[in-house]
């Protein structure tokens, strides 16, 4: 019913991980092309915060395999709310679109990710992103006015 392909998506240093995907995006990749690839993608699945933010800003379905946050003395990831991605997704009421990585592993299956992508509340996310953009614009106007 849904035809989706996984494509390895680079960070500024390129793709430094092994993957079984038939496609990958190479570097150098201009910033606007990077942004556009996320904006117009069917979905983004990954570990980095900035692509999650771009996805949310544009209403692109996303799922985070999250390694951010604090770890204890033994290297165990603490799912204690310290992850910046967890915070952002919580603000957008998308906690189910995230799983934590602990010691390089997470209990995740493809069905869970695909269901999250298919049920992604695009209109709700776009509306909230627009609200934050407007709030940010007002804040910047106030800062500039205070400097004059």
Residue ranges and their predicted role:
Residues 1-148:
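Active-site anion-handling motifs in enzyme catalytic cores
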């Amino acid at each position: 019913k849904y035809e989706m392909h996984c494509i390895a998506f680079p960070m500024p240093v390129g793709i430094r991980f092994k993957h079984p995907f038939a496609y990958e995006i190479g570097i150098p990749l201009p910033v606007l092309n990077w942004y556009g690839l996320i904006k117009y993608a069917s979905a983004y699945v990954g570990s980095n915060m900035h692509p999650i933010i771009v996805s949310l800003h544009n209403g692109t379905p996303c799922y985070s395999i999250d390694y951010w946050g604090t770890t204890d003395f033994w290297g165990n990831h603490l799912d204690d709310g310290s992850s910046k991605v967890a915070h952002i997704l919580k603000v957008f009421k998308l906690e189910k679109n995230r799983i934590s990585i602990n010691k390089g592993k997470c209990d995740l299956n493809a069905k869970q990710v695909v269901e999250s992508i298919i049920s992604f509340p695009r209109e709700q996310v776009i509306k909230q992103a627009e609200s934050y953009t407007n709030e940010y614009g007002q804040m910047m106007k106030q800062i500039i006015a205070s400097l004059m």
